């Protein structure tokens, strides 16, 4: 506590980021301040060299302050830099008392470039700095379904480089294009098609009506499989914005953010209004054992969404709640990012308040659907048994696979919201010579990626205590707070023992070892995670081995024997690198002419 007292006396008045740590050097909280000394001192009350929490702060903050053993600060040029650095560090290090919003992706837009002779609809996530470009969006989902539908319903130029070919392609043969490349349609005639395309993008009902007519024609012609494709596409497009019944007389362009939380769960809803209509929406479920701070959640949501330059900015950003101080900070952040003033406000009356109420109603509805399930109970029991500080809402599970230390690969699977998130799975080619160095490489590469993809609550390692300790060391060096458990087979005579009809599994934590009955739900939950990572790694290993066998066969056809292939692989590292290497480079490795 003496170190903390000394730090409080020697704080800078500069802008910067502060980090609080407990006695075990675990990161508790990251914050930012225009004046570090003033902000940090607001957490504490100091009398007679005794430090206690400031009673004016929330119970959540007071609970955190009681655990603070020391602090660190990072000085920056100004408050804007502090705001951006704070957000980046929270995502990378995942402090115990900060809220982590994972949805920081940039949503796609559909655009048409009318400066070209024959404009076509395309998808982008970036600003195209040229005149004549018209944007639509953002689309939280369904953008590709809209695009595919437009190309199938209208005789548009089907590919960006079609006009350059100067020759009609198969799309002209099947009447999906008018072949402007051969001047079979004038620019003026094509412009009418492009304008019809615009109308369908702007009016989802018109697009759906055309799709329904096509689906009906296919069905009448007994082309049921194709009709089903259109049925599914219609369903996806209808889900793009469940609030399309809202159509304001005023042509507002608004982004709307609503946060609703209770206990250890919360929901953030985002709605995007263009031309007085809600065109898309999204939500994110958030969990925290330490409660929520609306200011912190809103700050992270706004920075995540607007830190990349977006093609279309709203006239105004509406929030359901936020302190005046944070509102001002965010206003300055937006103005600085986009070099223009875009108002952020908390509506108190009128149709904008009605929009916030609709967003809140949806947040509350989504929240109410998040009922406690058997899986929640198992997670809570697992947390209690393994003495985890956080609920394992998001879990990353790791396994490696190899054959005689060749074709070494690793896999990471992700489990969140009670299901495997296959879009988040990752595969790795590894160079390690044994299972320990391979696991170390796999986990190190994942930890190095924390800045881009925030860490989870829990790592599950397929391995024993050695692999567990490897994981703990890597996480310690990364500075991120992630808890770890490992699962391994029981060993007899230093070998993994597998009994006929089922293997005996042991679960390892940093401080304990658990041998649970096969019927134990907590063991079964960990086994389910381990088995999926094992399946994923094994499948990747098999596909890698098959690919390598084919590439070896191709090299043999060129007169390169297995011993030479091994030399080349040892030197270049992969078959892809061998293919890219020049004959001279390969000759030098083999010391003979190939």
Swiss-Prot record:
SUPFAM superfamilies: C-terminal UvrC-binding domain of UvrB, GIY-YIG endonuclease, RuvA domain 2-like. One of its GO terms (molecular function) is DNA binding. Residues 205-240 form the UVR domain. Pfam families: GIY-YIG, UVR, UvrC_RNaseH, UvrC_RNaseH_dom. InterPro entries: GIY-YIG_endonuc (IPR000305), GIY-YIG_endonuc_sf (IPR035901), GIY-YIG_UvrC_Cho (IPR047296), RuvA_2-like (IPR010994), UVR_dom (IPR001943), UVR_dom_sf (IPR036876), UvrABC_protein_C (IPR050066), UvrC (IPR004791). One of its GO terms (cellular component) is cytoplasm. It comes from the Bacteria. Its main location: cytoplasm. Gene3D superfamilies: 5' to 3' exonuclease, C-terminal subdomain, GIY-YIG endonuclease, UVR domain, UvrC, RNAse H endonuclease domain. The keyword Metal-binding does not apply. Keywords: Cytoplasm, DNA damage, DNA excision, DNA repair, Excision nuclease, SOS response. The UvrABC repair system catalyzes the recognition and processing of DNA lesions. UvrC both incises the 5' and 3' sides of the lesion. The N-terminal half is responsible for the 3' incision and the C-terminal half is responsible for the 5' incision. This is UvrABC system protein C. The gene is uvrC.
């Amino acid at each position: 506590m003496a170190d903390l007292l000394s730090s409080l006396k020697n704080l800078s008045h500069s802008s910067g980021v502060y980090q609080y740590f407990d006695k075990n050097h675990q990161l508790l909280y990251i914050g930012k301040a225009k004046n570090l000394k003033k902000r940090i001192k607001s957490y504490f009350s100091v009398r007679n060299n005794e430090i206690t929490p400031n009673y004016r702060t929330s119970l959540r903050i007071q609970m955190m302050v009681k655990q603070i053993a020391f602090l660190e600060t990072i000085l920056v040029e100004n408050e804007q830099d502090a705001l951006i650095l704070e957000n980046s560090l929270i995502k990378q290090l995942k402090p115990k008392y900060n809220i982590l919003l994972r949805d920081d992706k940039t949503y796609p837009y559909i655009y048409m470039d009318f400066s070209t002779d024959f404009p076509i609809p395309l998808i982008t996530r970036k600003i195209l700095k040229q005149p004549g470009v018209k944007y639509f969006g953002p689309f939280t989902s369904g953008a590709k379904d809209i695009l595919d539908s437009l190309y199938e319903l209208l005789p548009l130029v089907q590919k960006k480089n079609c006009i350059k070919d100067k020759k009609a392609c198969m799309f002209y043969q099947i009447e999906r294009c008018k072949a402007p490349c051969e001047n079979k349609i004038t620019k003026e005639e094509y412009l009418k098609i492009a304008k019809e395309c615009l109308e369908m993008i702007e009016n989802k009902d018109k697009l759906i009506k055309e799709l329904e007519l096509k689906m009906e024609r296919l069905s009448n012609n007994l082309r049921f499989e194709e009709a089903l494709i259109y049925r599914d596409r219609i369903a996806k497009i209808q889900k793009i914005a469940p609030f399309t019944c809202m159509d304001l007389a005023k042509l507002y362009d608004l982004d709307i953010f609503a946060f609703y939380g209770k206990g250890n769960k919360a929901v953030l809803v985002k709605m995007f209004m263009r031309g007085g209509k809600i065109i898309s929406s999204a939500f994110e479920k958030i969990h925290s054992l330490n409660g929520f701070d609306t200011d912190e959640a809103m700050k992270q949501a706004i920075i995540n969404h607007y830190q990349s330059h977006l093609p279309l900015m709203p006239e105004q950003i509406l929030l359901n709640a936020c302190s005046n101080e944070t509102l001002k900070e965010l206003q300055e952040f937006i103005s600085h990012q986009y070099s223009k003033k875009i108002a952020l406000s908390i509506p108190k009356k009128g149709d904008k308040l009605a929009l916030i109420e609709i967003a809140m109603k949806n947040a509350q509805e989504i929240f109410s659907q998040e009922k406690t399930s058997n899986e929640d109970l198992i997670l809570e029991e697992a947390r209690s048994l393994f003495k985890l500080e956080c609920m394992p809402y998001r879990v990353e599970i790791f396994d490696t696979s190899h054959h005689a230390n060749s074709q070494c690969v690793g896999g990471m699977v992700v489990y969140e919201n009670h299901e495997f998130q296959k879009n988040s799975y990752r595969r790795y080619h590894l160079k390690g010579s044994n299972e320990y160095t391979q696991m170390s490489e796999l986990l190190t590469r994942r930890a190095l990626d924390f800045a881009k993809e925030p860490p989870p609550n829990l790592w599950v390692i397929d391995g024993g205590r050695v692999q567990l300790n490897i994981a703990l060391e890597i996480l310690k060096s990364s500075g991120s707070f992630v808890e770890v458990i490992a699962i391994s087979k029981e060993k007899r005579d230093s070998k993994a023992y597998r009994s006929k009809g089922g293997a005996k599994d042991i679960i390892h934590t940093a401080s304990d070892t658990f041998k649970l009955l096969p019927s134990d739900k907590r063991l079964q939950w960990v086994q389910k995670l381990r088995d999926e990572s094992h399946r994923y790694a094994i499948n990747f290993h098999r596909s890698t081995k098959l690919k390598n066998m084919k590439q070896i066969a191709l090299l043999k056809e060129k007169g390169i024997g297995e011993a030479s292939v091994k030399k080349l692989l040892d030197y270049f590292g992969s078959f892809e690198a061998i293919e890219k290497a020049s004959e001279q480079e390969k000759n030098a490795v083999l010391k003979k002419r190939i």
